[in-house]
Amino acid sequence: IKLEHGKALKAEHLAPYEGQGYTAFLVNKHETSTGVHYDMNLISDFCKRNQLFLIVDCISTFLADPFDMKELGADIMITGSQKALACPPGISVMVLSPKAINRVNNTKCVCQYFDLKIALKNMERGQTPWTPAVGILRQINARLKEIDANGGVEGEIARIGALATYFRDKIKGLPFEIVSESLSNAVTPLHPTTASAYDIFLKIKDEYGMWICPNGGDMKDTIFRVGHIGALTTADYDMLIAAFWELKTKKFI
């Protein structure tokens, strides 16, 4: 299902696929390039009506936005060590429902690269099939303890949400448009109305020593993103916003 940049998923987008014999629905809960956070209740209801196996890529929204796998009837959730876990990339995390585990264990498909059946069997003895990135696993362990000590999952979602709200309130008056119709807490996607998005990214990086997120392809000059996950504070946003205002004063934006 292809949507225009920044557009939310709606019932009319799903209607043509109703009752068409599909067996699974794969969705990235948050489309990171344009900052669109998809309506998982809409998708869940569609999958339940059509008896679809629901696989959700939560990599950029995990711990940033609410997600109740059981309530939504999701069968597989995928995330990673980067993004809101704020660890180096290198560990993929998959959570399987009982239905998904049963499906894996009963599949006749021969896997040559990534066999979840082997992973599940090794999990019974607390192991992985092959040596994982042990250093990153230890970092994830420490990070989860930190999250647990600071209000748990709900506390982390609230913290990230508060940072997103703070930033979005503070940029009012700058020549930027928020392009997403359905925002995630994880990131704010901005379209500069007076300058190239990529030129702004370079200027902020080279002259102010700060990194915002550029885009590629046909969005290179139209959209950049500012993240709200990881070890960020309101002081970081104050510095970035001051840089934006300085660029406006200099008529760069």
Predicted region positions:
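Active-site phosphate-binding strand-loop segment of PLP-dependent enzymes
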Residues: 9-63
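Hydrophobic beta-strand scaffold residues
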Residues: 3, 54-55, 178, 212
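Conserved active-site segment immediately N-terminal to the catalytic lysine
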Residues: 70-82
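Active-site C-terminal subdomain of aminotransferase-like
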Residues: 82-166
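PLP-dependent enzyme catalytic core of the Aspartate aminotransferase-like
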Residues: 218, 222-253
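Conserved PLP-binding catalytic core of the aspartate aminotransferase-like
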Residues: 176-207
